[in-house]
């Protein structure tokens, strides 16, 4: 390692320490996770062969999404087209076997629809992850079906089959797959994986022609999806290094030259709304290339994928600091974050889940498609506050709710965000002694101006205040003598249970609950719940690093 690079790293890490102490979190930031379904790697871990199996799959997915939400994740990239197979009822391709245990067989429910609904309940975007060029083992169902339908379209490399990127039918076929998903489901994005030449493909055309071939596929998908639903985001996961840099070599593994991915050109030409470069590297193989993505984003959203699987001793045994340093630099450069893959995040290898939960201690909105040319949506017309809730009038598909003890509520401060991408025009919440503001949000992620609540004098007369919480201990209200509850349940405003506690003492430890606004309920022996109040967990970020 040369002396110049040692000095550069020292400056970087000193700078990162200052960033950690600042505790600044952005209001807009992609925080994504790849949820892998092939072989049930992330989900599901059982087969749906009867109703019990279906419910077990659903319960497992709900648990995963709750964990993602607690870690501040706002975008789920879920593998939807697997290897010429799908996790939804398709007229074009057969069922993947990850759900039922038998390729081609329905699991008895629409897993894609269920996943979308559950993500939206939690205020998270759902992006359908479509594996494009690889279609699996040569004699497996997905590849076999495509070979029978298009005999000359599939090429064999080793034991695997691949769609030929040089055949124009590949572009139209993949566009039809993405159109089918977009037409039939309320997705927020189409996420293209392996949209490139296989590294083992002997490319006999010029690299320029190879890049045109891949770009033609991207363009066909983009045009068909945007014609159907222009607000659906188009993204992909290119190789993590775009090309060799003037001072840093990609070691022969890059998007532009090796596999003909002109990903930065796709941003420049408007074919991509987001990029998730697979940056599973560290130190001088990460930082310069991450900065290159930031500098060549052309105003679009870039969220580098982090190889958190290397934190697992069986995979690479990286140190946690390898990832945390990368996260701080990404945030400083206005880049998002994406985690490969879900299991390694929720398994908390080397404490990564704990760190991310604190790093993303306040909610964040996904950056809007600002280049859509859509007008600013209308703000809600008014807000009515009640003792235990609020209602408002509005015409936008989503709403973001903000709250603080000062007026007007600062809607630029993510600390004040208490609910994001909320559907409907009401919210159950204890409103005492707080001000509220609500913004409307359209399908493109654009926010309206804020409608501020003004009837705080009326709200101050409410006789049930917010519960006191110092960030570590929550003060409980006096327990009614007739209440048989033995447990306390902590929920998000969306209704997701994130913690349970024994209902015995006057105080409850909440030190492991992320910053946020929560509902506290009692749970009786017969499953009856009673709302005891609301509380805010708010800590100083600088003390956590």
Which residue stretches match the model-derived regions?
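Catalytic domains of carbohydrate-active enzymes, especially glycoside hydrolases
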Residues: 56-85, 184-187
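Pro/Thr/Ser/Gly-rich low-complexity, intrinsically disordered linker/stalk tracts
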Residues: 355-395, 445-458
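Recognizes extended acidic, P/S/T-rich segments that occur
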Residues: 399-431
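Substrate-binding cleft of secreted/luminal carbohydrate-active enzymes
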Residues: 263-264, 268-286, 301-372
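Aromatic-lined carbohydrate-recognition surfaces of secreted/lumenal glycan-active proteins
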Residues: 125-137, 191-192, 210-256, 301-311
